[in-house]
Regions:
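Hydrophobic/basic alpha-helical segments
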Residues: 1-181
Length: 181
């Protein structure tokens, strides 16, 4: 492939804006890197575990969760269960650290006690938030221009007047991606 008379090398893995994109459309390398970074930051939090619960909660959200959340809506819906559980395990270890809970404490109880959401639910909410910003013109015009045009010519009395025309796609990966269908 050529661009501006220069040959573009084909690669199997490319890091773009901190996100690893693979030619096979899997996110293994991305999850490996996210877990590695999050675990490093979690180990730093362990050294200050004597701070109050509120302080540890804020530190977790600033350091560890920000690493997990970066680009999460982009790939979360296409993750394998094993990859998603790796992210959930990082959050579970952080919840045990923040609360001082014992080893076999229920993940759901810890999340409920702290007011945290599961990684999957957080991804869905972040994705909805991003889509709302795009839809309500709170993003740059370039991003808004990538969205399909609303179907203005709808003559029927339906709840979704002015809704988006769905993309035509054939793959399961695209169907589960961030983009609305």
């Amino acid at each position: 492939m050529f661009f501006d008379n220069c040959c573009i090398e084909r690669v199997n893995l490319h890091k773009h804006l901190g996100v690893y994109l693979s030619s096979s459309l899997d996110w293994r390398k991305q999850i490996d890197e996210v877990c590695l970074k999050a675990n490093r930051k979690l180990s730093v939090l362990r050294s200050v575990k004597l701070l109050s619960r509120q302080t540890l909660d804020v530190l977790y959200k600033l350091t560890v969760r920000s690493v997990i959340d970066y680009a999460l809506p982009l790939y979360c819906n296409t993750l394998k269960q094993s990859e998603l559980s790796r992210l959930e395990n990082v959050q579970y270890r952080a919840a045990k650290l923040v609360t001082g809970a014992f080893r076999f404490t229920s993940r759901e109880k810890l999340n409920q006690e702290l007011g945290w959401e599961s990684i999957k639910r957080r991804s869905d909410n972040l994705g909805l938030n991003i889509f709302h910003k795009i839809h309500s013109y709170e993003t740059r015009p370039l991003i808004r221009s990538c969205m399909p045009k609303p179907d203005i010519e709808n003559k029927y009395n339906v709840r979704s007047k002015g809704g988006y025309i769905p993309f035509k796609h054939s793959g399961l990966k695209f169907k589960k991606s961030f983009f609305p269908t």
